[in-house]
C-alpha cells in the first residue's frame, strides 16, 4: 500500500510502502461456490487501497483502526485482524502493528 504516514512531517512528505495483512472472519460461509455468497477480497482490497490513499496520518495504529472500522462496516465479517508493516527504520526489516476487532465492539 502507498500512503503518507509518520510522526515527523518529513516522513509524511512522500508516500511510502506499507505491507498489509488482513484476516477476516466471514459471517456466513457460502453454500455454493459463488463469489456473491461471501466476501469479495478484490473489493476489500480496492476499498482499503482507496482508504489508505486518502490524506496523511501520523500513526500506523490510526490507519489500522480505520481499516478495521471500514471493513467491519462495509462487509459481512464478524471480526478482522489487521497487521501493517512499515519499512522505515534502517536497522530493522520492518516495524508494525497488529489489531483485532470484532463486530459490535466500540472502535
Where do the model's predicted regions map?
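N-terminal, polar/charged subdomain of small-to-medium soluble alpha/beta proteins
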Residues: 1-107
Amino acid at each position: 500500500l502507498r500512503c503518507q504516514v509518520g510522526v515527523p512531517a518529513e516522513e509524511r512528505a512522500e508516500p511510502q510502502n506499507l505491507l498489509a495483512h488482513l484476516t477476516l472472519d466471514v459471517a456466513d460461509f457460502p453454500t455454493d461456490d459463488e463469489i456473491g455468497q461471501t466476501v469479495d477480497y478484490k473489493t476489500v482490497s480496492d476499498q482499503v487501497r482507496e482508504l489508505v490513499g486518502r490524506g496523511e496520518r501520523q500513526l500506523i495504529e490510526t490507519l489500522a483502526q480505520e481499516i478495521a472500522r471500514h471493513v467491519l462496516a462495509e462487509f459481512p465479517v464478524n471480526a478482522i485482524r489487521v497487521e501493517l508493516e512499515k519499512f522505515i527504520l534502517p536497522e530493522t526489516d520492518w516495524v508494525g502493528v497488529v489489531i483485532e476487532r470484532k463486530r459490535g465492539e466500540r472502535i
